[in-house]
C-alpha cells in the first residue's frame, strides 16, 4: 500500500515525500505545479524523489476529477498538503482560495470515500486561531474568529474532514502548522524574502513596529510531527483529532530579522511600514497534545534553523551563479 501526498512538489510536501521514500515507503505524489511561485522551483524540489522506483508522480489538480482517475488504487493514507497558501494573497482572491482549499478538499474527500481509503492527515494552519486571547494557542480554543479568507478556508477544511470522517469512516488528524521554515521554504514567505533582500543589499520592509511574534517551526520538526500522527492513526481507529505542530516558543519580527541577517553574515537595514490587514499579532503553539498522542517534541532551535536555512539559501544562489 502507498501514501498519497497532495502538494508533493511544495515546500513541506517535497520534504515529506523524501523522508517517506528514505524509510522504504511507497509514495504517490500529486501536484499541479501551479504558478503561485516559479514552477521550475517545484520541479527541482522533486528531483531526488524521482530517483526512487517507489515514487509515482501524478500531475493534476485536486479540483479536477480526472486527476483522481490517474491515481493508483493501492493507497491507505493521504497526507493532504495541496492548497493555496498565504494570508495576504487570500484577501485579494478569496474566491480562488475557496475554490482550491474548500472545494478541492471536498473532492479529495469524495475520492477517499469512493476508494475506501481509511486515513487522512490534513495540513491546516495556526491562522485559524485569529487573534486568540488564549496564549499559548490550544486546540480546544473555538477557532471561530479567523481574520483572513485563507484562515477561514483552513477551518472549513477541518470541519469538512470531520463530517466525512463521521459519515464515511475516515480516520483523520488535522495538523495546525505554525510558521514552517527551512530549506525550500516558499520564496514569498518572510524568512526567504528577507534573506533575498539582505543578500542583495536591500532594506528589509518590516510591517509594524517589529514586536509581533511568531512560533517558527523548523521543517524537520514538522516532518517528525506528521510521521508521529501517521503512526497514531494506524493504531487509533475511529479517530478525529486537531493537533498543533509548532516550535513551542516565539520570536519577535525584529529579532527574526537580526537572526537571519546574522546567519547570512550581514547587517540589516530596516524600513518600517504600516501593519497589514489579516496579519495576526502573535502565534504560539501549545504542543502538549501532540506530545501526549504521539511523542512530538520540537528540537531545532531558531538559531540553528536559521543557520541551516542560510546555508541552503547561499548554496542555491551559488548554484544559480548569483553571488553577493
Stretches with model-predicted labels:
Residues 1-180, 223, 300, 316:
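N-terminal Rossmann-like NAD(P)+-binding domain of SDR-like oxidoreductases, especially those catalyzing
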Residues 16, 22, 60, 198-324:
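C-terminal substrate-binding subdomain of Rossmann-fold SDR/epimerase-dehydratase oxidoreductases
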Residues 156, 160, 164, 194, ...:
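Hydrophobic alpha-helix immediately C-terminal to the catalytic Tyr-X-X-X-Lys motif of short-chain
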Residues 108, 164, 193-198, 225-229:
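A short, amphipathic alpha-helix embedded in the catalytic core of nucleotide-handling enzymes
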Residues 135-136, 187-195:
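A glycine/serine/threonine-rich, flexible loop-to-helix segment
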Residues 149, 157, 187, 253, ...:
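Conserved donor sugar-nucleotide recognition element shared by glycan-biosynthetic enzymes
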